Amino acid sequence: MSIYEFTLNIGNINITNDNDLLDVSCKLYEGACADAAVMSVDEMLYIDFDREAETFVQAVTQAIKDVESVEGYNLQVISIEGDLVSLGEAAEFTGVKKSTLAKYKKGTFGGGGFPVPVRKASKKDPLWRLSDIADWLYQKGKVTSELVERARMMDVINHQLETRLMKNNDKYADITVCI
């Protein structure tokens, strides 16, 4: 068994004061989330976990079930943090210095081919898919295959969470897109 650290974003509750945060924290702790730390930023609820499990996927999926089964709240996990990252966040996750990642991005190091941003590409703070950066670094011998697999699993989990969210929301019921 290993301990996995991750953060879940909760989408259907607004935390407007300390009492709201305390109430939901107590309910989570009384449930199966004694390994969680709860925080609120701009009224959004985030839950940090240090979850023991056989695999990263088991840790995350059980945490999602535990959060969503808390009595008295209809909490819904909308995403796991970390699939889209800045270079600084990618540096934290991979253990490669941000300055080195910036040189890889510019092609100064690494021979080129660094992944392109997937969001805010023309902005000051673009976002990359962590799995793309992890895979590129793995090909260069800079990170482990386990790190790449974890980044990929975050992509898959978030895709499933987003699909569930859209499927259960009437706003999207009549929209069909062919790609």
State where each predicted segment sits.
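Short glycine-/aliphatic-rich beta-strand segments at the starts of folded cytosolic domains
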Residues: M1-N14, V85
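Short, surface-exposed ligand-recognition loops at beta-strand->loop->(often short) alpha-helix junctions
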Residues: N9-N19, T94-K97
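Short amphipathic alpha-helix segments
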Residues: I13-D35
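Short, intrinsically disordered low-complexity segments
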Residues: A34-E68
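Short proline/glycine- and acidic-rich turn/helix-capping motifs at secondary-structure junctions
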Residues: V41-Y46, Q76-E89
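Polyanion-binding surface elements
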Residues: E81-Y104
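Major-groove DNA-recognition helix of helix-turn-helix-type DNA-binding domains
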Residues: V96-P126
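A short, Lys/Arg-enriched interface patch at domain edges and termini
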Residues: L130-I179
